[in-house]
Amino acid sequence: RICATGFELLRQAGEQLRDGVELALCVGAESMSRNPIAAYTHRDGFRLGASVDFKDFLWEALYDPAPGLDMIATAENLARRHGLSREAVDTYALNSHEQALQTQTSGWFADEIVAVRNESFELDGYQPRGITLPRRVDAVTLDSHIRPTDFLALATLRAIHAGGVQTAGNSCAVVDGAA
């Protein structure tokens, strides 16, 4: 799973507490920017010059093979089922954007955010690993997805699927996160 792992952990902890566990610690992290890419066609090697079929796990994880739908199509089906108009979805998204911006601006979660910095991790016998931020970025201290918007900006965005209600402005972002 790649979405809502923090919420899933809270749900599981709640079940365990209900069943008698005295203490539950929930930690979740999602690194969408470092999602792996795999090659499944290399078991017998590659022919020189032959193309290699790579599969992006991110897009695979955003697609549910049981009904044959991606996450946006699932959201569109739910919008149709519950009679949600584009205007209603954009209004809800605007409210969410405004609350997130107000919370970030007020510093409500400032004590809970740990800055991510360029860092190297080394252990004898292993290759060094690390975190490398873009040039001229010393640290990431805020959620980069939260930014001001208005209803007109949301309303002018093109729907992802023709005739649908989901847009880049009212859908969940594909970002790194932790809970």
PLM feature segments, named:
Residues R1-E30, A79-F109, G177:
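Active-site-proximal alpha-helical scaffold in enzymes
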Residues F7, F46, F54-F57, F109, ...:
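Phenylalanine-focused residue identity feature
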Residues G14, L23-L78:
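Flexible glycine-/small-residue-enriched beta->alpha junction loops
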